[in-house]
Amino acid sequence: MKRIPDAVFLDRDGTVMEDAHYIKSPDQVRLIPGAAAAVKRINDAGVPAIVVTNQSGIARGIFTVADYEAVRSHFESLLQAHGAHIDASYYCPHHPTITGACDCRKPATRMFEGAIRDFALDPKKVAYVGDRWRDVVASKKLGGRGIMISSHMTTDEDRRRAQADGIETAASLGHAVEMLFDLTETPRSA
């Protein structure tokens, strides 16, 4: 029997918001067409929509934590203008060649584990949606359902790894949300 997830972990750049490569200013924020409606569908189901994002521009000195927070705030206000909201945001400010290895930068799982703890979630009952393999592979490490969507940042290597790991794919966030919230059973072939 299919069931809706208890929470949806969303990558930000390339999944909900257009990836303009190191977004450091609110005026660079653009929602991906259809993304606000997809987040609203998650909200309307009473399911937490939780952003989990790598932000190595902080470690690289391209933008500051304050810049990140200004972008996050504007991003969330754009969603709110469409009746959608994000329940929480988790970010990793590190980059391995600058700050050294960390346990929060995706594909590591610490940010997800923090959200699972903070929201008292069963990791086997959550969904992970992102445009890169590293955004969704936590579904294999922690449990749950991973769906990789396609963006201009999705590489052939991402696709190969997702296929090898048995991670589902979708054309967009809207399509991924349809997959997560469509509870009809798919007929089996004879």
Give the location of each predicted region.
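Short, electropositive alpha-helical surface patch
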Residues: G61-E76, G100-G114, L142-G144
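Non-catalytic pre-domain segments flanking phosphatase-related domains
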Residues: M1-R12, E178-A190
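Active-site neighborhood of HAD-like aspartate-dependent phosphohydrolases
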Residues: M1-I50
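A short acidic, helix-capping loop that chelates divalent metal ions and anchors anionic groups
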Residues: S25, G57-I62, H95-A101, D156-R159
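Acidic, Mg2+-coordinating phosphoryl-transfer loop and its flanking beta/alpha structural elements
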Residues: Y128-E168
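Short acidic-hydrophobic, aromatic-tinged amphipathic segments that line or gate anion-handling sites
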Residues: I167-A176
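Substrate-recognition element of Asp-dependent hydrolases with the DxDx(T/V) motif
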Residues: A35, V39-R72, H85-H95
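Conserved Lys-Pro-Asp/Glu-containing loop-to-beta segment of HAD-superfamily phosphomonoesterases
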Residues: D103-V136
